[in-house]
């Protein structure tokens, strides 16, 4: 993939990630002045995950590092705009949730219950379930670590 096509793919990915970030921010009753920042943070998070995956990271580690980035930026923006960090961060990580692998795991479970046990369906179910669980865990841990680092009251030593 050439550099120009990669930049266009990255811009498309970031633009398409900003749309659900704004949509979920509206569902969560985020103030109107913060909607553009939710969109920007969702685009930054999804774009950074795409860059890391293109560099060879697997999706779980790329998601974890992108969630760390989103959490850190969200805390900084919350100080600038005098708002809670969750206003920016929760809606921004929604585009990184593992919809396809969770859906594939659920379809595999339904097929196993309908057609009976088969080894390939069970492997598909377990691999997609573990992948989706790992991504959700990476998102939750990645969002919580910056708050633990930056809001620490006691000295680190």
From Swiss-Prot:
It comes from the Bacteria. It is found in: Cell inner membrane. The keyword Cell membrane applies. HAMAP family: YjjB (MF_01191). Involved in succinate export with YjjP. Both proteins are required for export. GO terms for biological process: succinate transport. The transporter is composed of YjjB and YjjP. One of its GO terms (cellular component) is plasma membrane. NCBIfam families: PRK09917.1. Pfam families: ThrE_2. InterPro entries: ThrE_2, ThrE_Dicarb/AminoAcid_Exp, YjjB. The chain crosses the membrane at residues 2-22, 55-75, 87-107, 129-149. This is Probable succinate transporter subunit YjjB. The keyword Magnesium does not apply. It is a multi-pass membrane protein. Keywords: Cell inner membrane, Cell membrane, Membrane, Transmembrane, Transmembrane helix, Transport. Belongs to the ThrE exporter (TC 2.A.79) family.
